[in-house]
Amino acid sequence: ALWKTMLKKLGTMALHAGKAAFGAAADTISQ
């Protein structure tokens, strides 16, 4: 179904955004 594809895309985007945010936070903490 189309909504499943959309949901998967949203999940992937959220995962990447979360990783980016976590990486930025880790960089800030380590400085």
UniProtKB/Swiss-Prot annotation:
Keywords: Amphibian defense peptide, Antibiotic, Antimicrobial, Secreted. Expressed by the skin glands. The lineage of its organism: Eukaryota, Metazoa, Chordata, Craniata, Vertebrata. Antibacterial activity against Gram-positive bacteria S.aureus and E.faecalis, and Gram-negative bacteria P.aeruginosa and E.coli. Belongs to the frog skin active peptide (FSAP) family. Dermaseptin subfamily. The keyword Secreted applies. One of its GO terms (biological process) is defense response to bacterium. It comes from Phyllomedusa distincta (Monkey frog). Its main location: secreted. It is found in: Secreted. GO terms for cellular component: extracellular region. Coiled coil: none annotated. It comes from the Eukaryota. This is Dermaseptin-DI3. InterPro entries: Dermaseptin_dom.
